[in-house]
């Protein structure tokens, strides 16, 4: 369990980083598009790139959600192990 948990936690750290970086890239591209518009330049390619960045960000967010669910499921499975009932002592009613 510890190995699987550690693996999921490591993957979650990477997924969090991807979401953070993806958000920064989307914000930066929006700023770039605004600058192009302000300068009366074409935004066609920049807008296409923005759509790709947004799609990539969404995939990273979905991956992070999947990892969080898997980690929660693993934690729940081992948090409260089901105990077997104790056998009655000999001679007890």
Per-region residue spans from a language model:
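Anionic, Ser/Thr-rich low-complexity intrinsically disordered regions
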Residues: 1-93
């Amino acid at each position: 369990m510890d190995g699987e948990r550690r693996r999921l936690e490591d993957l979650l750290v990477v997924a969090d980083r991807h979401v953070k970086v993806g958000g920064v890239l989307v914000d930066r591209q929006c700023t770039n598009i605004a600058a192009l518009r302000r300068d009366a330049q074409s935004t066609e390619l920049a807008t296409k790139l923005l759509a790709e960045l947004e799609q990539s960000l969404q995939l990273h967010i979905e991956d992070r959600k999947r990892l969080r669910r898997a980690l929660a499921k693993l934690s729940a499975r081992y948090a409260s192990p089901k105990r077997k009932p104790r056998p009655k002592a000999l001679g007890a009613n």
